Each structure stands twice: as structure tokens, then as C-alpha cells.
């Protein structure tokens, strides 16, 4: 399998290097399994003969125009831009966009993580497809690319020839998925050597206040929830207190966060419950009561459904 990894000016250093390291590890271990795949042919490519990363390191690249044959997979690691406006500006009208479209139309599989997902979305290849991105970029991604079926709670989304991964160190999951799609056994071995565990969801790492802060109504909603965590809550009553209609609140949470008002309430409660579990000696029942659940089984069920772990595991991780 031929894999081209894009190195661009301003690339996120660890994202680029971890993709290369996972693939190199796969190559070094492939003889350790029965019927291992052929070696991965990895090419670092770009728009010129060198690229300067976000930390100023110079990386030699094979220009896309000089590639002798098409890769099977084209990987776009993240850029080091740290705010949504800078990311959007960096990607808008970038010369890589035309290449992405051309490669995809030629049958090449595309993979991207974190801010790199903005390249795929900006090129249009993600329209009508499910995808993920870094959790803190969800609101900006949703606003700019409404035709993409974004689920930013997921760490990895594979849809045909399109693979997207979440926040910065989801580059590991992205690279490992490329290995696993060709050889599950080799992928498992690589994950063991590199001590990579399954991380199906990035929701546990999201900061509700940061996500809501992109919209004044949602910022007020988030503050109101935290001020009344232990109290019974009706969305219609909260909307009235915020001076908006329930429908307006529903539209805002859907457009910015991709969830319902009740889902957001549950996320804020889970965020506080996680904090209490990890920083206090309160019993599980006391924590449940502190975040508005009279029955601890309700909190247990919510943790299992949304974080995919047990309450005890949440406390110790």
C-alpha cells in the first residue's frame, strides 16, 4: 500500500510525526504476524520540496506534481493554527484543496485529523458524508460546513474512502485505522507495542463552557445550568428565564452544538459529576444528587451511554 502524508508549512509537528511513527512501527512489526501485509510505502509529500512545520522544523517533501504514481491513501495531518478563525483562514483557498478533490476523484482514499479535517470539508469531498473533527472545533465546523454530517463526539469516523479523526492526538487513531483496515492483526500488534487503547469517543474531553461560549444564548444557558445543577429542570422554563423561546433554544443548540437542549444539560451535569468524582471523596449517590439526579442509577446509565465506561472507571481515569 502506498501512503502519501502531506507536510505543509505550519503543520502540527506531533500530528505529522505520529502518523509517520505508527506506519513505521507497522512496517517493522509486519513480519511478526502470520500472513502479514506487504510493507507500507510511505511518501512525505507537499506543495514544494520542503515544508516548515509549526515549530520551524524543515521537512523534505516530494512535490505532489512530481509524484510518479497515485497513492492508495492520502493523509492530511493538522495545521498548528490554534483558533477557529485562523484555521478557516489558513484553509480557505489553499492550493492543497484542488489536489484533494483531484485525488479523491481518481479513487484515492483520504484521511485527516483535527484541523486537517477542515481541508477535506473545504474541498467539498465531505459533503453528504459523516465525519468528525476536534471537539473544540465543532461549532465552527458545523457553521462553515452544514452539508457535512458532523458527529464531533466520535474519535474516528470511517465512511468508504473517507476517514476523519478528532482532536490532535487522534492522529494516532487515524494512522492505526489505516493499518487495521488492511490488517486487523497487525493493527492490534502495533497498538500493543505503542500502548494505544481504544478511544471511541472524545466527548469526555469536551469542555461545555468553551463550546457554548461561541453563542451568547448558549453561554447564558450553560451558566444557568451550572447555577442550578441540583435542581429539577424544564427546558421550557429555562428558555423563558433566558428570554428566548424553547424553539429558539433548540435551534441554537442544534446549530452550534449538534445536540438538543436536554443533551447539553446532560453534558454539563456529566462534566461536573466527573470533576466531583475525581477531586472529592463524595459517594456516587452524593455526586448524583449534586448534579440533579435523585437516583444514582440514572447517573450510572448516563455515564455508560455517553462516556462508554462505568462510574467507577470514570472516577479513576
Question: Where would I find each of the regions flagged by the language model?
Answer:
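Extended, subdomain-level signal for the structured scaffold at the beginning of enzyme domains
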Residues: 1-110, 119-121, 187-188, 197-317
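Flexible, glycine/proline-enriched loop segments at strand-loop-helix junctions
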Residues: 84-89, 127-129, 162-165, 177
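Short beta-strand and adjoining strand-loop segment in the mid-core
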Residues: 120-133
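Structural detector of well-ordered beta-strand residues that form the stable sheet scaffold
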Residues: 110-111, 132, 151
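An amphipathic alpha-helical interaction segment
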Residues: 135-138, 144, 149, 156-209
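Short loop/edge segments at beta-strand edges and connector loops
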Residues: 46, 152-154
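Short, small-residue alpha-helix embedded
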Residues: 118-120, 177-178
